[in-house]
Each structure stands twice: as C-alpha cells, then as structure tokens.
Curated annotation (Swiss-Prot):
It holds the Pfam family WD40. Residues 1155-1165, 1194-1205 have a biased composition (Basic and acidic residues). The gene is CFAP44. This is Cilia- and flagella-associated protein 44. Residues 1348-1389 form a coiled coil. PROSITE patterns: WD_REPEATS_2 (PS50082), WD_REPEATS_REGION (PS50294). The keyword Transcription does not apply. Flagellar protein involved in flagellum axoneme organization and function. Residues 1155-1224, 1420-1444 are annotated as: Disordered. One of its GO terms (cellular component) is axoneme. It comes from the Eukaryota. It is found in: Cell projection, Cilium, Flagellum; Cytoplasm, Cytoskeleton, Flagellum axoneme. Residues 1425-1444 have a biased composition (Acidic residues). GO terms for biological process: axoneme assembly; cilium assembly; cilium-dependent cell motility.
Amino acid sequence: MAAPAQAVVKEKPPIHVYPQAKIGTKIFTHHGIHSMRYNGVCALTGSTVLMASGRFVMFVDVHKGTIESMQGPENGGVGAVAVHPSRQYYVVCERKPSDPAIRAYSWPSRTEVGEFVKGATKGFSACAFNKDGSMMATVGMYPDFFLTVWDWESRGMVLRSKCHNTDVYTVLFSPFDSGLLVSGGAGHIKFWTMANTFTGLKLQGLLGKFGRLEISNVSGFVVLSDGKVISGSESGLIILWEGDLIRCCFAREVDREDDDGTAATFMARSYDYTPCHEGAINVVELMEGGRVLMTAGDDGYFRFWRVSELEVAEGEGAPPLYVPECLGEILVHAGAFIRSVTYCKDVDEWVVLDSAGVLWRVPYVHPDDILNNAVTKPKEQAVPALEFNGGSITSAALSPIDHTVVTGGEDGTIRLVDYVTPRELYKMCLPQPNVVIGLRFFQKDPEKKKFLACCKSGAVLLVKRGSTAFTLLGQWRPHNDGLALFAVDAAEHRLCTIAHGTVFFFTILDDFSSLEPIGFCKIPLPGATCVAWDDASSCCLIGFECGKLLAIRAPTRDMVDQSVSYEFTCNYALVGIRQRKKVEKKQANVSAGEREGFVEEEEEEEYLGPWPVRLICPMADGDFAIGAGGVELLYKYGLHVRYEGQKELPPLPPTGIEPPDYVEEPLMNLCYRDYTPEASSMSYSGRYLVVICEGSQMLLRQLDEMGRVRLEPILVASAHDRLDGPIAAACTSFDDKMLVSVGSDGLVVAQLLDGCIAPQPPSPVAQLQPLRAEEIVEPQLAPFSITEQKDLDDRRRAEDEKRRELNLFLDKLKDVHQKYARLLRENQSLALTHRLSKEEITIHPQIYRELQEEMRQRVEESRKPTALELARENIRTRKMRNRFVDNLAHDRFLVRSFSKEFSVASFRTPYVDGSIKLFQQQIDELLGSERCSSLACDGDRGIVSVASGEASQQSPRNLSLSTAAGVVRWLNSEERKRNEGEQQKMNAAHREAEILTTTMRQYLNKMDERREERHWRKKGYEMLLAHKPDPAVEEASLNEELRRETRRRGECILRTDPSYHSAPSAVIKLQQLIRLEEIIFNMRNNFSNELLKLRDEKERLCGTLNVSLQRIRAINEKLKDKSFHADDVKLTPEEMPGKRFEISRDGLVAFMKQRQEEKLREQTAKKAQRGFGADLATGEPATNTDTSGADTPATRRSEGEDSRKVTISANRDSFGTAAARTRSVRTGTLAASKGGRPFSGGGFAAGAARERMNHELRVKHENIKLTEMEEEELQIERNRLLAERQRLHTQVQAMMDEFDVRLWSMYEERSRVDANLCLAHTHSLLLFREYNILLVFRQKDFELQSSYDEARNSRDRCLREMEELQRLVQDQTASIEKLQEANKVFRREVEIFISNSFPAEHVPYITKVFLRQIKRRKHHSDMSGNDDDITSDDDDDDDMGEDEAWEEICPPNCSEERWCEVIEKREVRLDYVDAITEERRQLEATEQRIEEHKALADKNNAAVSTCLKAIEDFQGEKRKQLNMLETLVAMRCGQVRCLDEEGRCPDTFRRNDLVVVSDKVITGLHDRIRALAEEKHDRRGKLKSMVAEQQALQRERSEKQALHTQWEEKIYEAMLLKFGQIVNLEVLESSCGSREVEQLKERLRLEELSWEKELRKRDKKIAVLREKLHESLEYNTSLLQTIGDQESDRQSVERSLAQSTQKVVSKMYDSINVATEEDRSNLRLLIAAQQEEIDALRTEVALLRTKGGHVYAAAMAAGR
C-alpha cells in the first residue's frame, strides 16, 4: 500500500497551465482514397464497393461515381474492412492506441449488429471470412501481429496465435477446407492448420522457405483443392507451394540453352527466364470452382492460367521453373499498378484498385470463355470509374480567392480540388515525375492565381492556375536532388531553398512571372529541419536537428559576382533561445534523510534538451512561433539575442550564472496539453495560427486585430488516421470558415469551424466529353517448328474432345437449371400460403457432401497400407535429425591448406536454446517459490544501499593506482568519506535557512563543486606527476592495457576487490550461467562463420586455380612433359560435410556406376570359377572392353576438347600442324570405336588391324624431318609455352601461399578461441558450484527477507495511520474554530434581540438568564456515566449560586412570547457549548493516539534497522563462502617470475610468492617520457626551420608557375603552327604501331570500366542492406520501448485501482459521515463483485500471454 503514496510524492507538477479547450470544428467533406492498401476494395451489392481510407469507411458506387462514408474511431483509424460471403454484413477493423475492436454492421442499413473485442493491441491489418461465413480470421498490426479466428455467430474468439514478426498484408481461408489458412506479408508466407492436439484445437503454422529464390513480399495467394498454395511474388513469378517448400515456379519463358551449345548436365542450374508479370503480383484468385487462376500485378495486366496444369507441374533448374500455357490476358491500362481486385456479381464487373489512385471497371470474363481462348480481344475495354491522387499527398496550398486547394503528391501530379463539392477540377503531370514537397500562392499577385511548386528533385516551378488547366510559367533547378525546405519573405520578393547543406536565394520579379537566381552558400550546420524569413533583419532563419537556430543574412545581387561563381560566403548568427520554460522545483514534503535523494532522482529523470527545431512561423506582430520536438514546446519569441559568426553559445563565466540577455526566454506558450508540435501555418487573414502536431492532431490559435494570441486554444476534430496517417499540410480558407488538411492517407479533409455558415458549392460548368480513340494492336504470330506445331495440334485436339464432353454435360446441366428456374418462377407466382420456402425447395444438398466424403474415404484407403510404415520412418528420421543435425548451428568441418601441412577445424556448435530454456524454467520456479518478486527486488535494493555504505568505509589499499581513472576513483571515495559529516551539516543548514532564488542556489552549488574539483585535481596531479607529459594519453594506453588484460583474464573485478559488493542469489547465478552459455555459443559461432567464409573462398579459389592448372596441363601435353604435375585442386569430403545429406543427380550417377562395377566384379568372380575359356565362350573380351571404356568417354571427350583447343591455337600461331593432324586422326579413331557395338571376334581383328595402321602412320609422321625454319618456330613456341607455364605456376603458387597465410591466422585464432573456451567452461563450473552453495542459503535468505518485509510493512502502516490522525486533528481544530465563531455570532444576535425586545431595566436580568449555565441530560446517543455535565461560559463572571425559582419568572411588562424565545435561544447556546466541549475531548483523544503511534513507529524503525543489519551480515557470510571457492585465473608466461634456485620453472604454482608483476613497465615508461621530451624539442626546432623553408618554397613556386604559364602559351602556339591542333605527346609516344596491341588495350580498358561499374553497384547494394539493417534495429528498439511503456501503464492502472479501493473502504468507516449497516453491506457486495471481475480479467490476460494462444470461448462467457 506504500506505492500510491510514493507515486503521489514523486508526481511532477505540469510545466504549463492551460484553460480547458473544446473541439471547435466538425467534418464537412473529404475527397480521395488510400490507393496503397492491399485488399482495399470489397464488393457489396449492386455496383457498390467497400473501402477504407484514413479514419473513414467508404461506400463507393462505381457506376454513379458517388462516395458515401462513415467515420471510424475518434482517436485512431480503420485498419481493414471485409464483406461477409452473404453480402448482408460487413466488418470494420479499427486501429487505435488501445483496445481496438472489430465492429459488424448490416447492409444496406449500416446498423451495428455486433462487436469483437480483444483481438489486437493497437489495430488490425487484414481480415477474411471462410466460404460459408461461419468463421472470420483477423491479423493484428504491430506490436503483436496475432492471428485470431473468430466465431461469427457467438462473436467469440476460437483460436489465437502469433502470426509473424513483420507486417501481414493478407489472410485467407481455404475455400475447400476451413481448417486451412494462409497468411502473407512483408518477406514471408505462412501456412496454418487447425490441429486437434491433446490440449484441444490449436493453430499450427509453417513458415514458407524460399530456398534459392529471393525472399519476396507476398500479398496474393490461393489454396487449391489438394492443399497446395499458389502465390505471387515481387519478381513476377507465380510460385506453387507444397507444404512449406517451393515445388515449382511458373514463368512465361525459360532459356534452357547452354552457353557452349551442349546439353545441360545433371546438376541443378539456374536459367534465364521471363516472369509471368513485369513487376510484383498483388492479386491471385480462383475463378468459379477453381478451374482457372487469375493473376494481376504492377504491369497492369490480368492473366489467366489453367489450374489443372499448374497443380501437377514439375519444374527444372534452381529454382525449379516451368512454363505453363497462358489462356489469355487483359490490359487494364499501360500505366496501371493493380493493387486489389473484387468481383461485383450484380453488374458482372471487376472493380480494380490502382495504386495510381484510379478505380477501374473491367468487364468480367466467364471461365468457359477463358478456357476456349476467347479473351484475346475483349469486347469492352476497362473504364476508369473514379480518379484521385495516387499514394500520399505531400503538400497543399489553399486558394486565396475561392474554396479550392492545390495538392501535390508522391505520384508527381499537381491537382486542383474543390473541397466543398468535393471533386477534382483538373490536374497537371510534371515533366519529370517527382514528389512535390511544397506549394505556396502569391498573395501580392493581382489575380491571386500564381503559385510556387518545389519538388524533391531540386526543381522550382512557377505555375499559374487557369480556368481549365495549369500553366507552367517557368522552372529552375537550383539543386541536383534532395530539395526539402523553402520559404518566401512577407513582401514576396525573395525566395530561399535548402537541400543537402546548401541554401539558394532567388529574387521574385514584381509581376511574379519569373525568378532571378542570386547565389548559394553552404550552411555551417547539418540537418536543417525548417526555414522562415525574418523581414526585420533581412535574414533567413533556419532550424536544425541539433536544436540550434541560425540567422543567415540574405545576399543582394551586387554581393555575388555571378561571372565567377554563384557561391558566396555565408554570413550567419546564432540565435540564442531557451527551448523550454524554466520551472521552479518545489521541495517535496519528505523526511530530511530522503530529501536529497529525491531531488537527485528528479534531476536525473528530467531531460533538459536540446530538442530538434520543428517549425518557425512568423507572426503579425513581428514575433515568431518556434516549436521543438518535445511535448508542449511551442513558444512565442522575439529573437533579439544573436551571436554573430558563432555556432555555439559562449561559455558561462566562472560563477556559473548566466549574464543578462544570454539567451531569450519564451514569451508565451502556444501549444496545448500533451501535444507535440510538428508544423504550423498562418491563415491569409492573420486571424488563425494552425498548429499540426504528432499523431495527426491539430489545434487553432486565434489572434486579435493587434496580433495578440488569445489564451483559449481551439481543438480540431480528428480527420486522419492517428496511428498511420501523418498530416502533410493544413490551413484555413480565404474567409476563415473552413479548415482543410491533407495527409499520407491520400485524403483532403475539409472541416467547418463552429459558428460559421457552410459555403455553397459552385455552379457546374458544362464540359465537353473527351474523345477516346481505340488503340489498334498489331497481331504477332509466334513461330513454331513442325514438331512443336504437331504437339500443339495433338494437345488442342485432346482438349477439344474433353471440352466437347464437358459441353454435353453442361448442356444437360443447363436444362436442369432451366427446369429448376422454371420451378422457382412457378413457386414465386403462387400465393403466399402455398409458396415453398427456400429451405424446402433446395435440391438435394446431401449429394455434394456424399461425394466429398467418398473422395476423402478413397484417399484415406489408398494411404492405409503404407501409412504406418511411413509414419514410423518419418518420426524416426525426424528424431534423428532433431537429435544430431537440426540442433546444430554449425557442424564440424575442416579447411585444409593447399600445402597439406596443416588444417583448421571448426567447432561443433549446438544451439543453446534448450539449455537456456531449462535455466529459465529453474529461474521461474525459484521466483515462484519466493511468492513475490517485487519484495525480493526491494530487498536487493536495500542490500545494495547497505553494501555501498560499507564499501565507502573500507580502505582502498587494493585499488589500482597505476591509471588516472583509478586515482580519480580513489580520490572520490576519500573525499566522500571525509566530507560526509560536513555535507550532512550543510544540508541541515540549507533546510533551516531561507529559500534562496534559483540563480543564487545554482551559483552556490557550482562554487562548491568547483572548489571540490580543484581540491582533488591538485592531489591527482601530484600523484600523476610521474605519468607526464600527457596524462590523458597515458590513461588511454593504460585503459587499453586493462581491456586487453580483461579479455585475457576474463573477469575485470576480482572477488577480493573492495569495490566488489553484491547480493548473490541463485537466480542471479542462473542468469549469469545463461549469459555465459550465450557467450560460449557466440565464440564458437563467430569463429565457425569466419572459417565458413574462408572455406567458401577456397571453393571459389579452386575454380580459379583449376582454370590455370588446366592450361598448364594443356601446355604439358603440347610439350609432352609429364614431370611437371598440375593436378586439379578440390575440396575434400571432410571440408564439405553438409553435402552428405544432399542428393544430387551426379551423386546418383556415381552410385549407379559403383553398383554396376560391383555387380560386374561379382559376375567376373563367378565366371572365373567355371574354368579356363569361360570368358571366351561368353564374350568376356567385349565385356572387358566395355568396362574399360566405361571410364573413357569423359576422358576421350576432354581429350577431344583439348585437341580442338590445341588445333585452334596452332592455327593462330602457325605451330603444331602435324601434331594437330596426328591428334585429330587419333581422336577420330577413338570416336569411331566409341560408338560401336561390343566387339565380336572379327570385329576385334579389324580393330587390331586399324590400330596397327594408326601406329605405322604415327611413326611415319614422327620420322618426317623438319626444316630449319620449322625447327626454329617449334623452339620459339616451346620457349613461349615454358614461360607461360612458369608464369601460371608462379601465379598459382602465390595464390595458394596467400590462402595458406590467412588459414594460418585462423589456426592461431582457433588456439586463442580454444583457450577462451577452456576458461569459459571453467568459469561455468565455478558458477554452478556457487549456485549449489546459494541454494543452501536460499531458505534463510527468504526468512530474513520475510521478517524485513513484515517489519517494513508494520512501519509503513503505522506511518499511514499517523498521517490520517494528523489530518483528523486538523479537521477537528477547524471544526472547533467554526463552532466557536458560530457561537459568538449567535450570542451577538441574541443580545441585539434582547435589547430590542425588552425594556432597558430588564435587559441585564434577561441577559443573565440567557447566559446562565444549567444542568442538562445529554443526548440519548451518549451513554457515558457523567449525566450532569455542566460547562461555564468564558464571559459569565457573576455568581450563579442563587435560587433558580425566580429566574424562570418572566419580568413584568415583558412579553411572554419573547421570554420563551429567550429560553429557547439559551438551549441553542447550550447546544453550541456542548458541541465545542465534545470536539475538544475528541481532539485530546486523537493527540494521545498520535503519541502512541510515534512510540510504535520508533519501535518499528528499530526493527527494520535490525532486519537490515541481519540481511547485511548474512550477505557478507554468503560472499565469504563464495570467496572460499578456488578461481582459475589465466596468466601469461611472462608474468611467471619466481623460479627455483637452479633457474627452472617450479613444479607447482600453488605458492604465494610465485606470481609477481614485472617492473620493466615502469622503467620503460620513464624512458618513454624522456624520449618524448627530446622528440618534442627536436620537432619544435624542425617546425621553425620548415616554416622558413615553406615560405621560400612558396615564393619559388610562384615564380615557377609564372614561367610554366609562359611555356604553356609557347607550346600552344607551336602546336597550332605545326599540327593545327592540340596533340597529346605522351599518348603519342606511348602508342605502338601494332593494331592488335591497341585493340587488346582498348578491350582491357573497357573490361576494367565494366568491373568498376559492377563494384559500384555492389557497394550501393551493400549500403542499402546496411541501411535496412539499421532501420530494423531501430524498429525493434522502438518495439521494446513500447512494451515497456505498456507495462508501466498496466502497473499505474493497478496502483490507481488499489488506491480507489482504499478510498472506498476509508469512506465506509469514516467517523464524520457514518454509513448505515445496509450501505456497508451493499458496498461490501460491490467490492467483492469487482474483485471477482478483476481476478477473471487477470486470468484472461495471463492466458493470452501463453505461447500457444489458445482461448476457450465458453470459459470466457462463463467468467462474464
């Protein structure tokens, strides 16, 4: 119960106080659609489709061209919409910051019929129904991405599971089985099944694996009848999925021809292909029964495919490609980007959502026509129904003369929109499509129709608005790209644009017909965010991301010499402003011992900037509105404090007090509570300031005639999506009646201000219908060969036969349908009493179910014989893989060196998820047994505070004083210990003294801090004197040495270190074990990854080397030299262990050959047993010949290829003609023998004769005597080949040696990793021993913690009771004062009454009677024993002891009625007296109880201190036991100094005097200091001499340059006289006379240029990938922060609930307002019911947090 009180104490007061604001606008019209949504259109009835844009649900009639809308949630938007299959309902999925819902509506009444709750955290991104509409699936957006299945009838949640960790675009039920679902989105596709498990029905998902195919976004897919899935991709391929793997990819064309024209090998290879669509495929749908597949994408085409062909296709290559037959295609438009498609049955049309902002109507094509190839020329073309802006609207400018707005968007168009009607009047497409970032009308223009348009490409356009179109007056390009900001001064004479750190200035002509450039300068600071003009100082104000504000003086035309350059020197000044208003910190009402800690904590939590400057808006009175990127940081400034030529504020004086006018303080806050400003604009009339804030929020600030801002802001109604629809621009209309805003959701929203009359729409202007010409498409004939044509004819003939049979069946079916329709019409014509219902007239729906059941049974029967064995094998294989393969991040593999002298092995690295999960379970069990983790955290915090106090009292003798950081730490601890008492006294004096001003307090604090800094800095300099000349360099070097020592030793802080004080527990040790396991895994994994990269590099290197080695072998063959070995290099099986699980075609062929050889050896062995001649009888020689030839074809082929290559080179070089002829003859002989049959006896003799003839021919060729010229040519060629072989051998050897050197470095790294792993395993063993020890102490630790918690709770309860009693004392004192004051007033009134009602002589007597005290019996409610309570009045001093009888007699000549009134008033006075007495008695009793509670609080404080001391002692005992364990510390051999007497290393290292630190380091440091001093002196002398030499060289350089200029002029004249042109003599001298050499050089240059281009492309790709990685990291970080914020919100809600419960209980038993027994019983029942509801909600939340995501709808309903 202490948490709420603590939260109240630490609650910060608000920075600004605002008056209560109300919404002062209402939605009037909106125009546009969100064209970038997937599944953005859904068909309703008729020609109406359902769409969602921003926070509006739209009903679009594509025939009439009208749009009706319904607003979504106020503080969010619409995430997705879907239509029920019955088309009688539709659902709207909300998107809100918290608790989004799914609302179901009926159509066409649009009334809400139901609600689905708790399906997502912030909103939904996709929604779909199953075929019969009984179930609905939704997918949440970030941060949860939950897939939820709902029951439509009960509105309950059926199943739930985490879908993916990225955006999900589409979710889909299978039309054939509602238990199958598919979801797809950013970079993934996932397949879901509703599986029955032993815990019930659950969702099980498989993530699709793209394999070799590039990962793609998937937005369109369908499920086939056999469970396969067909999806689209970004590359334009259609993908067929089976399970979670890709079975086939469909393309329009595949190039299967090899580069060299030979047939492809058995290895899977990649082919070039033409995709099915040019661009992404966004739509994939099945048409009527699943016979035809329709796809559509960004190329604007509909294409149709036969499903029966796709589902059985088998691809070839990697990825597997297949070319299906395209049944037809429909072109929507050449520039269309199809995003979504829906089919309107009532009008028989497709409605297409185009990303360019167009809704198209496409005539529907029947599947029969598609199968009959009748869609080559559609009868009707696609018609645009509605046209809007494509994508986001990035800028807008309102017309100063009428109710229109000019918008610019991402699609590169400028549009004029009438927001009253609303409708688009006309548009202009820019010459170069680009993003329009800003628009502005010229108010000084007489016609007020000219405006500026700035584009992101760097172009500035001057445009004029006409009656029917825009006119481009001119365009300028001051920047190459990246134009982001622009501003026009108030007089509209100057323009400045900003892009990429430069600002360009223009002059605007008086007639606004052109711009004249002045010049540009570079901005001194990066990251410009906003810009505005300061007309008073002729400066351009620029805000930056760093929070600074610069004023750049605008140049004039005379200041820039444009004949030389447009660049001029930037003249700037820093504007000094305080971004947030100063707030005086109030002292919290806490105890004296806790006040200092509270103030320090508040100062740490408070962020003091700087914030990025987001907006600068000039105001009418000359001031500026400046907004920063923080909450409520929008102020009004004068901007008078400036620092010329400065980028930083000047430093403060030594006193720390800001001088006057150091920075400008804010004049007025212009924001509102919890709003963060983003942009602003001023209305044309100057009456309104429009402020755009984060989260699509807006507010208006109204100004009076003098330009002063009124205090009451006006809030603007929500017009755009609060979560995903930022506002790009907003402003009021020319008459200040309307507020128009545009945003990234593509909407133009107009709102009417309260109290204003809506403007009338303009009168329509008749326009001519544009003429459209039909495009003539030239037919193209596809060339076919005779075989292809024959196959095509056969296939068509078979298809025609099938189609004929199908048509016969369809004709019969048509007759049945006609008869059925006739029966329906007859039934409809009957009377209502005789008419059959729809259920009664249904024709045998059981037939379909029986057929489905029969098919299912057949499939099950076919699977039964092998089902058991197959399941066993699958389970066995899965278990083995899970146990030995799948649990490994890296398997062990070797990388051998080329020299074969050494090899490096990787680490067999298993995943650590299992062990970490086991440790986490143990942690959960330990935390669960402690019953309250928060208590443990509080205890740990208390223990840490005690331990820190103990650490401050210990001696720092063990601290390292060898570094500056160690000395600083020691000095700080010494100063804290010495000044602890003085600081307490100073704090007490400060608390008792008067409250100083903020400036004086800061000054005194800074003086104390600086005095303390000077003190310990002086001592530090004395100790660090030996570390001269530069302590910072020495500290850095020593810190680096410490880091190296830490990495080598493993643990920086030893347990014997005095700064090591912890509260060890079993949970902490388990967490340390988890971190250690992750470290070990990372070490293994990182090394294995590096070695894997090296292995892959070796594999690539082998391919490169084999090319050179193959050339060497060819040279050896030419030279006939077999002594020079050049065998191919390849990876061994040990280096590629992963291939043992791969099954390739080459491996199967090799296995088949091996099996054939084994069978052949067995047959040979059997024949050998039959005796001599058995082989001759069965043709054994032929068999042997074939056997030997089995290995020769490849060899022969390679020899043939080599021979052909040699022949070509010989012809080129005129060498080896005879040898080539000889090889060709031999090759032809072998080729002839290769194709023959197995030899018979005659064939064998003929072969022998041919061999003899070949041998004789060979001998004759060899005996031919060559001429001297031929011998010389042969010798030259031999020398050339030897040189080439030597060069190639040297190159190969160098590449091998370089690889071996890198592999050797990996070998050394492996040794280091081995050592680190040994230390890590030893450390893990130490942590496990510590964990076992801490388990023993765990019970006692828990008991001490429990006793501490009890004592602390008692103390807190006592303090709370004391606070309540003190408040009660204050209330009672105030009540007594009120009663006394009322008594005095009443007495004065009675005295006046007596003096006016009785004679003067009787007034004293009657007054005495009135003031007399009499004995009265107390009220019956007072049951005390003292009934005669007599009180005396303070003003009555007379004797009251006379007889009472005469007092009751009315005096003579007095009215009896007045006398009775006096008696009654006396009773009233006595009642006052009794009440005051009773209150005083209660006050005394309360004060007595306070004294008792104070004594009890002292006892509780003593008990808490005793518990803390016991916990501290117990923690010390635990640390002592842990320190008794032996710790392994890794040392270097150079650190072992102690040897025995003989100079040998001792036998054991367990000696105290064995390990010492070397003192050579200190000697080396002294030597280094002296060397540096000498070097410094020498370098100063050298610097002086070099300066003098530089000056002399500069003078000489000037002279040489003048002489060089003269010679250049002479050479120029000489070349003109001699050659007539300028000739490059160096190129002329370097060129040779050979044309072939020049051609080769040119080819080499072109090749190098292509390589450079490829390298630049790769570098750009790497940069893009790095950017994506950085964005993913930021995105995940934001998700973690969001989770933390939500957890904080949940805790605050629980605290508020507990506090409200306490208030209700306190009110129930309040002593002032006592409730009746019935009220108390009712409150008890209410509290009990609320507690039950809270418990049920907590149970539900805990259930939703479970991993499985299973929810029982029945249990939830019962809980409600």
